[in-house]
Amino acid sequence: MAERANLVFHNKVIDGTAIKRLISRLIDHFGMAYTSHILDQVKTLGFQQATATSISLGIDDLLTIPSKGWLVQDAEQQSLILEKHHHYGNVHAVEKLRQSIEIWYATSEYLRQEMNPNFRMTDPFNPVHMMSFSGARGNASQVHQLVGMRGLMSDPQGQMIDLPIQSNLREGLSLTEYIISCYGARKGVVDTAVRTSDAGYLTRRLVEVVQHIVVRRTDCGTIRGISVSPRNKNRMMSERIFIQTLIGRVLADDIYIGSRCVAFRNQDLGIGLVNRFITFGTQSISIRTPFTCRSTSWICRLCYGRSPTHGDLVELGEAVGIIAGQSIGEPGTQLTLRTFHTGGVFTGGTAEHVRAPYNGKIKFNEDLVHPTRTRHGHPAFLCYRDLSVIIESEDIIHSVTIPPKSFLLVQNDQYVDSEQVIAEIREGTSTFHFKERVRKYIYSDSEGEMHWSTDVSHAPEFTYSNVHLLPKTSHLWILSGGSCGSSLILFSIHKDQDQMNIPFLSAERKSISSLSVNNDQASQKFLSSDFYDKKKSGSPNYSELNGIIGTSHYNFIYSTIFHENSDLLAKRRRNRFLIPFQLIQEQEKEFIPHLGISIEIPITGIFRRNSIFAFFDDPRYRRKSSGILKYGTLRADSIIQKEDMIEYRGVQKFKTKYEMKVDRFFFIPEEVHILPESAAIMVQNYSIIGVNTRITLNIRSQVGGLIRVERKKKRIELKIFSGAIHFPDKTDKISRHSGILIPPGRGKTNPKESKKLKNWIYVQRITPTKKKFFVLVRPVGTYEIADRINLATLFPQDLFREKDNIQLRVFNYILYGNGKPTQGISDTSIQLVRTCLVLNWDQDNKNSSLEEVRAFFIEVSTKGLIRDFIRIGLVKSHISYIRKRNNPPDSGWIYADHINPFYSISPKAFILQQSLRQNHGTIRMFLNSNKESQSLLIFSSSNCFRIGLFNHVKYHNVRNELIKKNPLITIKNSSGPLGTAIQISNFYSFLPLLTYNQISVIKYLKLDNVKYIFQVIHSYLIDEKGRIFNLDRYSNVVLNPFKLNWYFLHQNYHHNYCEETSTIISLGQFFCENLCIAKKEPHLKSGQVLIVQRDSIVIRSAKPYLATPGAKVHGHYREILYEGDTLVTFIYEKSRSGDITQGLPKVEQVLEVRSIDSISLNLEKRIKGWNKCITRILGIPWGFLIGAELTIVQSRISLVNKIQKVYRSQGVQIHNRHIEIIVRQITSKVLVSEEGMSNVFLPGELIGLLRAERTGRALEEAICYRAILLGITRASLNTQSFISEASFQETARVLAKAALRGRIDWLKGLKENVVLGGMIPAGTGFNKGLVHCSRQHTNTLLEKKTKNLSLFEGDMRDILFYHREFFDSSI
C-alpha cells in the first residue's frame, strides 16, 4: 500500500467520468478490496449529503442567461441580411440554408457555453446547475432547453427545420414555436419506438458473429503489431485518447529511450508506463491487438490485453467475443432511449475560425492559393498546402500557419482589425459527422420567361431532356410576364409612347400571351384564337401547330398568325392584297362553316416567287383508316415530283409533295397495327377473322378480313385486308392480274360465271406457301379531282376585276406517293390532298433578283369601325445580301428576332410596333400623311445575348446606293435588315470587389468573370420598303454613354457607402435589386432594361436566382415557367444530425459493408496497387499474400476509426479492442481467385486468411486470393458451425446444404453447445486440461518459417504507422 505522503489532495467538483478515472487509479494503487471499501465510504457520504441538502427543482431556479437578448438579436440581424442577399441573388438557397443553420447553431452553442459560468458566478448551489453536471440526472442539453434557447429542431426524417425556436421552456413558446417543437417531440417518440428495435437487433447480430471467440491460449507467438504515435506532422494527438488507446494493451516490441530499454515485449501497459512514454516523448509504440493474433477461431491473452473488469491480464476461458458484442450494442440501446428526453433538438458542428490577434496588414504568397466561393457564398481563397500568413503592425510581426484545404477570407495587403476572422478551417478535419449527398430543388416563385447567361451549357444533359448542366457560377433570371390561358391575339390601336407587349407563341407550351397597356385606356379588341372550342364563337381551330410552327436553331419562335375564316374578302390595288378578318362580334351573329384556310407568313414577312401563301385541307379528302394510295393504273407515269412545296430554306421541312396532273386517285383501305416484339398475338398468319376479334390482350379488330403478320426489326406489323378471297383454277391466268386495279364493267372472277363490276377493285395475289396461292379482291375508294379550283370559290369576284402583276394561283398536292402506305395515329384523320395558294408575279428582267413580296398585318379605323387586314405588297429589296449570309445550314432566314412588324393604320398616322427580343418595344410616331410611303421611327437595340451581329459582311453596294441618294446619311458599321440595331462598340465594366469593411456584404458578389457587355441604342427611320435611314444628324448625343452611380447596401445602416463608376445603361441589361441607377437612390427592384430614354429608363421586373457549378437547370432558354415549376436542382453534402439515432444506421452500414463510401471499393484499388508493386519486387508467390494482408490490416483500422467516430461524438467511450474483435471476424475471410489455379481450393471459395497462409506454406506454392469484406450477417452464415448458422437465419437452407455436403460440427462455439444442451466451453474456472497451452518449442519453428516475412516487417509497420497517424489527426 502506498504511503499517505505520496497521495495528492484534490479539491474540485468531479463528475461521472472523473469518478471512473478515480476508481481505475484506486484499483491500480490499492487493489480491489481496498477500492471497494473506499467506494462504500463515498456512497455513504453521497447519500448523507443528498439527504441533508434535499435538492428540489422549482420554476424560480430556472434563470435565463442575461446575454441571451443581444445574442438572439445579433443572430436575427445576420439572418435578415442573409435573406436580403438571397433576394438580391448573391447567395443561392443551399448557401442560405447552410449559413442560417450555422448562425443559429452558433448562437445556441454560445448560450450553452455561457450557462455554466453564469450559474457558477450568480448561484453556484442552484439545483438546476448541480443536477445537470452531476451526471446522475439530466444533462447540459436538457438544461440548455430550459434556461437557454430550444434552438433548431429536426423533423421525424432527421431533416433540419430552418426556423429556430428562440424561446426556452421557462419563457414559454409561441404558437409557431410550439408546432415546430411538436415535430421534434414526435421525432423523439418515433426514434424511441423504432430505433430501439434496430439497436437490439444490431446487438444480436454482433454477438452472433463473435460468440465463439474465447481466450484459449496465453501467447500465440505473433511478432506483428500496430504502431501508435502520440505525435504527427500537423498536431498532437489528444492525450486522453492516446492513454485510452494504450492502457490495457500488451507491447509487441521492446521500447527504447536512447540506448535504455524502458519496457519489454509482452509487457502489459499500465497508467504509470503510459505517462512515462508521454513524458519522454516516445515516437511510436508497437502494440499487440486482436488483429495480429495468429489463432484461427479464438484469441490469446497477450493479444487481448487486460480485462476491463479487474485490470489484470484476461483470464483463460473468458468469453471476450460476447463481451465485445454487448459493449458495442448496449450504448446504442441506451442512447436511443435517452434521445426521448432531448426531443429531437438538432446538433451539428461549427467551423473553426482563425482570428487576427491585433490590427495590421495581411501578407501571404498568392501563388499558393486560388479564388473560390465558400459554403456560404463568401469570396475566399483556398489553400493548396500549409500557408504562412504574416500580420504586420507598426512594431510587431506575427505569423500564422493555415492548414491545407482551408479558406482564407482576406486579400493580400488588406488591413484587418483585431479579432477579425481571417481564415476558416475546413469542416471535416475536426468533426466526426458523416456526410451524405442531398438534392435540393428550387422552385420558381413567379410566372415568367427564363433567361440565363452564356455560362449555362446550352446543350441538354441528355437527348430530348430539358436539363442543362451549369459549368460556372451564373445567374438565372425569371422575367415577369403572364401567359394568357385563352390564347388571345391582340390587334388594337395604340398611341404614341404606349408600352406594348407583342403576343409571342411558345412552341413548348402552345400558348399565346398578350398584354396591353394604353395611355388613355382605350377599349381593346381581341381576335379570338381559341385552341379547342369551335362551337361557341366559330373561332379558328389550332388543333395541330406542329405543321405550321417551326423553331430555328437558336430557339426563336415564329411570330406568325394563322386564321381560317369564311368571310375572306380580298381587295387588290397596285400590287397589293388586302385580306380582312372578322371580329368576334360579327362571328357570333352569323356562324358560317369554315373552309379551313391557314395563312402562313414567314418570320421575315418576305415571300419569294412561287411561295405558298396559304393552304387549306378539304374534308372530302380526309380518311380515318390506314391504307395505300394508287395513281390511276400502274402505267400512269404523269407524276411530277417536287422536292418541297416551300422553295426557300429555313422553315421546318414538310414531306415530299406530288403535284397532281391526274384527275383521279385511289385509296385501298387496310387496318394496320404495329405491335412490340414481345406482344402475344392471338391470331395466326393468313387466317380470316371477323369484326371485333381479339388480336392481342387489349386490341380488337375494327374490320374483318385476312390477317397478314410481318416481323420487322424490334416490332411486329399486323395488317387486316378486307375483301373477298378467290381460289383460281389452274386454267385461270390470274397471276398476270396480281397487284392491279380493275375498273368497273370488266373482270372475270370465274370462267363459268362472269358479271360486270360496279366499282373499282384491287386484285392482290397471296402465296402462303410455295405451292398454294389464292387471290384477294379488295375494295377501292375513288377520289376525283378537278383540274383547277377557281379562286372565285375562295374570294369574292371583285378581286379579279383589275388584272395586275401579283397573282394567286391554286395548286393541289397529294401528300403521299404512289403505292406508299398511309398510316394514322389512333383517333386522328389522314389528309390525302392539300390545296395551296401560291404567290406569283411577272418578273422584271432588269431587277429580277430585287423583287419580293412583303406581308403586313394592318388595322384600319374608319368612323369607329375597325377592321384587320393582311396586306401583301410587291416591293423592291435593296438588301440583296440576305441570302448570302454566313449562317448554319437550314437557316436562310434572317435570325434577328424582332423582324415581323405589326402595322396599324389610322387616317393620319402610321405606327409600327417593333418586337424586341423580350417581346417589348416603344412606339414612336412619325407623321407624314402627304406622301404614300410613310416612315416610322422606332427604338431598338442589341441584346447582351445577341447571336451574330453582321460584323463580317461587306455592304459596298448598299452603302453606295444610299450615299448617292442622300449624301448626308452615314451608316456606322453596317446596316442590317429591318429593325436590327447595329453594334457600335462594346463597353466592358467589371464590378469592383470592395474591401472597405470586412463585414460589408460586397464580399457576396464574387462571381466567375463578372462581366457585362453594354451596347448602345440607336434611332433609325424605316420606310415601307425596308430601307433604313438615320435622319438624326445629332444622333451621336444619344450614343454617348450615360454616367451613372451605383452602390450596394451594407450591413452598417448608418452610412451608405457609394462607389462612383462610369456605368453604361443599355437595353437588355440585367440589374440586381438595390443598385444605384440615378441620384444615389437605390433601385428597389431587380429587372432587365427595356427602354432607355434621355431622362428615364423602363425596366421589366425580373427575379434573379444564383446557381453554382454542378447545379442542373430545368427548362430551355426562353421557356415559359409557371409558379411552382422546378427551376434548379442543387446537389450538396450535408452532415447528418449528431444524434446517435442518426449515427446508428451508419454503424450498421459499416458493419454490414453497405457504406455509402464503401470500403470494399477502396480495397479493390489498394490490392491492385500492392500486387503490382510487390510482385515486381518479389515475384508471384509472395505478391498476393503480402498485398492482400496489408490491405486487410489497413481496412481493419479504417473500420475501427469509423465506428469510434459515431460513439465518441456522443461521449460514449468504447475500448478499441471490442470493436477490433468484431472487425477481425468480418475481415478474416478471403476469396480464392482464378489466377494461378490451386489444387486445394476452388475459385470463388471463401476461406480464412490464416488457413490460406498456412496451406500455402505447407504446399510451398502460391494460393491466389483477394481480400473481401463480409457483413456481420454474412459472416454469421459463413462459420465452422452449421448449427450456429441455422439458429440465426435461413434455417432450412443452411441445414439442407450442410446435409448435402456432409458437414461436421465440432461444437467449438458457445451457441451450438447451448442449442444441443451441452456444457458451455467457456468460463474462467474451466478445466485447465482442455485449454490449449502454449508450447515454447513452436516459437522457434515459427521464427524460422517467418524469417522471410521479416524482410517486410519494417515497411509494413511504416505503412500501418502512417495510417494510424492519419487516424490520429482526425480525432
From Swiss-Prot:
Binds 1 Zn(2+) ion per subunit. Its EC number is 2.7.7.6. Gene3D superfamilies: 1.10.132.30, 1.10.150.390, 1.10.1790.20, RNA polymerase Rpb1, domain 3. Keywords: Chloroplast, DNA-directed RNA polymerase, Metal-binding, Nucleotidyltransferase, Plastid, Transcription, Transferase, Zinc. Its cofactor is Zn(2+). InterPro entries: DNA-dir_RpoC2_beta_pp, RNA_pol_beta''_euk, RNA_pol_Rpb1_3_sf, RNA_pol_Rpb1_4, RNA_pol_Rpb1_5, Rpb1_funnel_sf. Transmembrane segments: none annotated. GO terms for biological process: DNA-templated transcription. GO terms for cellular component: chloroplast; DNA-directed RNA polymerase complex; mitochondrion. Its main location: plastid. GO terms for molecular function: DNA binding; DNA-directed RNA polymerase activity; zinc ion binding. It is an enzyme of class 2 (transferase). It comes from the Eukaryota. It catalyses: RNA(n) + a ribonucleoside 5'-triphosphate = RNA(n+1) + diphosphate. It is found in: Plastid, Chloroplast. The keyword Plastid applies. Zn(2+) binds at C220, C293, C300, C303. Belongs to the RNA polymerase beta' chain family. RpoC2 subfamily. DNA-dependent RNA polymerase catalyzes the transcription of DNA into RNA using the four ribonucleoside triphosphates as substrates. PANTHER family: DNA-DIRECTED RNA POLYMERASE SUBUNIT BETA. NCBIfam families: rpoC2_cyan. HAMAP family: RNApol_bact_RpoC2 (MF_01324). In plastids the minimal PEP RNA polymerase catalytic core is composed of four subunits: alpha, beta, beta', and beta''. When a (nuclear-encoded) sigma factor is associated with the core the holoenzyme is formed, which can initiate transcription. This is DNA-directed RNA polymerase subunit beta''. The gene is rpoC2.
